[in-house]
Amino acid sequence: MIEQKAVEYSREDEVMKRNMTRRNFVKLAGMAVAFAALPGCATLAADTAVKKPDGKQKVAGTGGERYVPYQERQGAESVVYFTRDLSAAGLLQIYDRVKKDLGGKVAIKLHTGEPQGPNIIPRPWVKELLQKRLPAGTIIETNTYYGGGRDTTEKHRQTLQVNGWTAFTTVDITDAEGTAMLPVPNGKWFTEMSVGKNMLAYDSLLTLTHFKGHAMGGFGGSNKNLGIGCADGKIGKKMIHAGDSGSQWGVNNEEFMERMTESTQAVVSHFKDKIAFINVMRNMSVDCDCAGTSAQPVVTPDIGIVASLDILAADQACVDCVYALPEESRHDLVERMESRHSMRQLTYMKKMGMGNDRYQLIDIDNGDKVITAAEAVKGVKGTWVPDGN
């Protein structure tokens, strides 16, 4: 068990957290990545934070800045479903393809957003999903590591009300009453991860993700939704973002991707086959929904929704769709992905045995035809789907 004193906030951490607004989080995350890119600085945090108990140094993988084309990948293929229908009806239709193992007490992990966040999944879509498919389902969340509208349970509940979630459902802030440790099978950085205690009360998990960019992860898909989103606000998220570096945001690039992925592995391993993944490619700012109203304007066109029982295949399919867009449409989001070395999310998930980076993309709009990512985005233009709330 990780000693509490090794992961608790110090008094200085608490002061820093109070001063860390979501806007500053986005700015400082970018500065941390830029600093790491300077000659001689890329492994500064790792040099002070990656010693194993036996004294050997742990080393993060490389190559996270490089996108691997489909033809260069090897291994089995998973199934990924795809629809262009960005609506409540489209969400229901694609959910039906992956719902078979979701039973008992079902949790729905999604990003409920900072106050007035413009890009989060529309509440009317989620309301219809709950009412028509998951009437006993519960949205789960955790408090944030950075200061803002969700870093305490009290503020988080206020933000849930502001953003319209409490008008039709309740949200379980799973770390409001404490934390629990989950094992990380075959982890390099962790043997355990700290998560919200209440998550363990659920039998199955639907991962409902707004796919978009991310200040530190490059992109935020199902991996980020679980890896950061299920880690509790005070212990788990600090384990990922800071490690033993002594800095609130001391971990970045490939090491950050690996730590986040190991956190996800803890959650996925806990639920075993009672888990499914849906990624909504809509309003894809280069910034995460953590940025709230300060997120960069959306310039990447909306694409559609993917769903799979394979977390890696789901995230890989979204990345492939972005890369299949015309250069002028994908430029900003691709730059964010590559500058943060985000492809290490994908290659590390594969290394950890979490899924396949090859898949059959099933077009449920056209008789379940198997298509390529290029065919999925053919004709996509700069569209904006309104929230409808």
Go through each PLM region and give its residues.
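Cationic, low-complexity basic patches in intrinsically disordered or flexible, solvent-exposed regions
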Residues: 4
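N-terminal and secondary-structure boundary signal
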Residues: 9-13, 17-389
